[in-house]
């Protein structure tokens, strides 16, 4: 008779969790950041608020964003005028859109990842779906399983309302699942659309206006597994993962689901809270590896906004090229909440290959994925690149 210890040993993988494929997707509707203030104040019937529009124009100009993708077209907004007011009851209509479009966009990203993986979808054993953009039962994890035609025995986990740090969270969970379930192949999907957060401007709530200038729609999917087969193509190894709450940060970032949709609130000191806590997180993650030069690792940082990136760069003395991939994704897509860091991973491995660098991590061996969001919660994932 076997022992429990022998059973557990047989259940565990031998090697570290490894990212085997990445896929991304966006809605077709693309908005230009330079002209967005004119569009936004026109569609929300707020053109008479000239001073507020000028403030919003400055926010957009300083955002370092070139364009964003949004499911909400002018046609949809005209059909749902309550979305365009600041505080009009509208949750039912928003939910009706989100519960359909969130899994649909996630499916596009997942199909891209599965194609890049090159293995039958029947080998997927676990699904982790993450969104801050809608709540339903059964959830988007169930809908995705049906849309992709996955096996009914696939093990699912649904993550709601985690916010911008959750791209790190899903990788942490996938690491634990892959390393503790021999042969597991975990499909993680982050799908975010702004249908629950879009609303008209308010002079009394400029933090809401900041969100209107930054957030965009996008979905990203990653397949994670340990002990890759010869037919699989490893991209990054997940070495360690940690989560912590920043001290004295209660209320720095929070959100509330109300009849008017999802309201976000950001304090002005968020950039300083993040930058003041990042080095401690890095030290705890990299001290066991003997690494203390933050320019010697590659960076996957949730963009948040340009002020946060600037302060992190300054605090750590990072060279400008360290956050190139992060700034590129912010410019091309805006802040896509949980999906952002996975888009940045995809951008980095593609650019590393195109530029002829030696590894998927810009030619470097070790890297960090850094996410932050409501709490203020910080996720730190240590990555190990593979040769290109």
UniProtKB/Swiss-Prot annotation:
Gene3D superfamilies noted in UniProt: 3.40.47.10
PROSITE patterns, sorted: CHALCONE_SYNTH
Superkingdom of the organism of origin: Eukaryota
Biological processes, Gene Ontology terms: flavonoid biosynthetic process; polyketide biosynthetic process
GO molecular function: naringenin-chalcone synthase activity
Pathway: Secondary metabolite biosynthesis; flavonoid biosynthesis
Keyword check for Acyltransferase: yes
SUPFAM superfamilies the record matches: Thiolase-like (SSF53901)
Family matches, as InterPro entries: Chalcone/stilbene_synt_C, Chalcone/stilbene_synt_N, Chalcone/stilbene_synthase_AS, Polyketide_synthase_type-III, Thiolase-like
Reaction it catalyzes: (E)-4-coumaroyl-CoA + 3 malonyl-CoA + 3 H(+) = 2',4,4',6'-tetrahydroxychalcone + 3 CO2 + 4 CoA
This protein's record includes keyword Ubl conjugation: no
Residue ranges that the Swiss-Prot or TrEMBL entry lists as coiled coil: none
Enzyme class, UniProt record, top EC level: transferase
Pfam family, one: Chal_sti_synt_C
Active site: 164
EC number in record: 2.3.1.74
Record key words, sorted: Acyltransferase, Flavonoid biosynthesis, Transferase
PANTHER family the record matches: CHALCONE SYNTHASE 1, HYDROXYMETHYLGLUTARYL-COA SYNTHASE
Family: Belongs to the thiolase-like superfamily. Chalcone/stilbene synthases family.
Summary of the function given for this chain in its UniProt record: The primary product of this enzyme is 4,2',4',6'-tetrahydroxychalcone (also termed naringenin-chalcone or chalcone) which can under specific conditions spontaneously isomerize into naringenin.
Entry protein name: Chalcone synthase LF3
Species this protein is from: Ipomoea batatas
Gene from which the chain derives: CHS-LF3
């Amino acid at each position: 008779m076997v022992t429990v210890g022998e059973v557990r040993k047989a259940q565990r993988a031998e090697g570290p969790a490894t990212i085997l494929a990445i896929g991304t997707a966006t809605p077709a509707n693309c908005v230009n950041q330079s002209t967005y203030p004119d569009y936004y104040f026109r569609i929300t019937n707020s053109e008479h608020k000239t001073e507020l529009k000028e403030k919003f124009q400055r926010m957009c100009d300083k955002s370092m964003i070139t364009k964003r993708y949004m499911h909400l077209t002018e046609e949809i907004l005209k059909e749902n005028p309550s979305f365009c007011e600041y505080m009009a009851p509208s949750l039912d209509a928003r939910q009706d859109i989100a519960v359909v479009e969130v899994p649909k966009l996630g499916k596009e990203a997942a199909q891209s990842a599965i194609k890049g993986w090159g293995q039958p979808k029947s080998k997927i054993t676990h699904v982790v779906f993450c969104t801050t953009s809608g709540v339903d039962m059964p959830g988007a994890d169930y809908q995705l399983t049906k849309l992709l035609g996955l096996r009914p025995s696939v093990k699912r986990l649904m993550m709601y309302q985690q916010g911008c740090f959750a791209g790190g969270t899903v990788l942490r969970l996938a690491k634990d699942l892959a390393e503790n379930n021999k042969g597991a192949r975990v499909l993680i999907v982050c799908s975010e659309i702004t249908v629950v957060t879009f609303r008209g401007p308010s002079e009394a709530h400029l933090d809401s206006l900041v969100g209107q200038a930054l957030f965009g729609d996008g979905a990203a999917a990653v397949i994670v597994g340990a002990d890759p087969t010869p037919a699989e193509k490893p991209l990054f190894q997940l070495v360690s993962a940690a989560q912590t709450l920043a001290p004295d940060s209660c209320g720095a970032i929070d959100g509330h689901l109300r009849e008017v949709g999802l309201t976000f609130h950001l304090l002005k000191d968020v950039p300083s809270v993040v930058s003041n806590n990042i080095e401690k997180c890095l030290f705890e993650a990299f001290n066991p590896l003997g690494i203390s030069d933050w320019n010697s690792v590659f960076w996957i940082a949730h963009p948040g906004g340009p002020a946060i990136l600037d302060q992190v760069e300054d605090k750590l003395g990072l060279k400008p090229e360290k956050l190139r991939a992060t700034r590129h994704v912010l410019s091309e897509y805006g802040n896509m909440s949980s999906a952002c860091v996975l888009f940045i991973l995809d951008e980095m491995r593609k650019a590393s290959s195109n530029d002829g660098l030696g590894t998927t991590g810009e030619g470097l061996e070790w890297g960090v994925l850094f996410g932050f969001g409501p709490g203020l919660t910080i996720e730190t994932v240590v990555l190990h690149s593979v040769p290109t």
